[in-house]
Amino acid sequence: ELVPYIDANFKTIAKKDSRAMAGLSMGGMETRNITLARPEVFGYYGLLSGGTYSPEDIKDPSQVKGIFISCGSKEGPDRIMQAAEALKAAGFNAKGYVSPGTGHEFLTWRRSLREMAPMLFQK
């Protein structure tokens, strides 16, 4: 497994609350699948133009420290903001972000990373 290898070979804090997984586009969809299947491994989840989470998707909300979902304004942003609001209403630390004037492109994802980074690993 990759996570044990990283923890063994790099200076990490080998705890779930000190790990995040994020992906863009298809990598976001894979991030969604992995974080839902293995909530004990990652505390923070990020989907950048990679779909959404709903409160019903997450079996144990206490496992999740933060969720970030984003897309470009040309990608159908209503679903992103609705999902973020539903997660917040269910008690999750969640943030939705829409990159203005962009689509499914690297400018969207660079802006998304800038918005997501400050919410990671907060106490």
What are these regions (language model features)?
Residues 1-123:
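Non-catalytic cap/lid and distal C-terminal segments of serine-dependent acyl enzymes
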